Design a protein with these regions (language model features):
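Short, surface-exposed charged micro-motifs
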Residues: 79, 146, 201
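Active-site-adjacent helix-turn-beta-strand microarchitecture at beta-sheet edges
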Residues: 114, 119-192
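Conserved, well-ordered active-site substructure
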Residues: 123-141, 190-241, 247-262
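Short acidic-glycine loop/turn motifs at beta-strand connectors
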Residues: 82-84, 148-154, 182-183, 204-208, ...
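Bacterial N-terminal signal peptides that target proteins for export
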Residues: 1-8
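C-terminal motif of bacterial Sec signal peptides marking the signal peptidase cleavage site
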Residues: 17-19
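Zymogen propeptides
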Residues: 21-139
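Active-site-proximal beta-strand/loop segments in catalytic clefts of secreted hydrolases
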Residues: 83, 114-118, 159, 215-216, ...
């Protein structure tokens, strides 16, 4: 029997972040304290590549650390690679009623919980979501991509190359944007906007395996991430940006407290 793996959206974390941004009463500035100059310790550079670690049959973990020309640590990319033969994928969605990753995991018992998609201020999806075989919202047209669960299994597709057909019997789906790797492993985001942020990605490699990735330090622009994925040895056929900014996150349950990124 396949283990359950859910792509869950949206998150209460978005609401909590908004609450943290509320204005606070202005306090008197603290007194200035001058300390003697002491050289700061040089941060230890983590291994650039952990290699694939098998967590259980069909599930592998890899951590890739990115450095610049001066060998300074810029980004950490957590990659989970899943063989669809071992897992059941699904999308859960409560319009207007977001939950935290931990709450979704407790409610569903899923092995892996990942947030994704874009929403209005009232937490309604701006693109198409299919949850429990029921459609919500409207499909993007000509841009972005879709994570879909069909009778044959999960897939990541380009909506420009393969538009959504309301007649197709999808079990679950989530649309997002932009496409970072176009089908065939081609660069998906050629323009540089200069905006750095944390990112969550879903991808499918040439062997049909599903990858969930999170770039946790916020160093990548969309173009930079697109270029990185295309040049990597992950052999990705197509990759879709799921989320960006503080809400990016995934939760992998397991022994102890599990693995949380984001």
């Amino acid at each position: 029997l396949n283990r359950s793996l859910f792509l869950i959206l949206p998150l209460l974390a978005l609401l909590l972040m908004a609450g943290c941004m509320a204005e606070q009463p202005t306090a008197a500035p603290p007194p200035t304290i001058f300390l003697p100059a002491t050289p700061l310790p040089t941060p230890t550079l983590p291994p650039l590549d952990s290699g694939w670690q098998t967590l259980e049959p069909g599930l592998e973990l890899r951590i890739l650390n990115v450095v610049d020309e001066q060998r300074l640590w810029q980004e950490s990319v957590t990659v989970l690679r899943l063989d669809p033969a071992y897992f059941r994928f699904d999308v859960h969605y409560r319009p207007g009623k977001p939950l935290q990753l931990e709450a979704w995991q407790m409610e569903t018992g899923a092995l892996l919980v990942v947030n994704g998609g874009y929403y209005t201020e009232e937490y309604f999806a701006t693109g198409l979501v299919i949850s429990g075989t029921a459609p919500f919202g409207s499909s993007y047209a000509g841009f972005g991509g879709m994570f879909a669960v069909t009778a044959a299994g999960p897939e990541v597709r380009s909506l420009a190359a393969q538009p959504y057909d309301p007649a197709e019997p999808l079990q679950a789906a989530l649309q997002s944007f932009p496409l970072l790797v176009r089908p065939g492993g081609e660069l998906g985001f050629p323009d540089e906007d200069g905006q750095q942020a944390r990112r969550t990605i879903v991808a499918q490699d040439r062997a049909g395996r599903i990858h969930f990735l999170i770039a946790n330090r916020g160093a990548f622009t969309l173009h930079g991430l697109s270029s990185y994925l295309v040049a990597s040895d992950l052999e990705l056929d197509v990759a879709l940006n799921l989320d960006g900014g503080p809400s990016s996150g995934l939760l992998l349950a397991g022994e102890g407290d599990g693995v949380v990124a984001g």
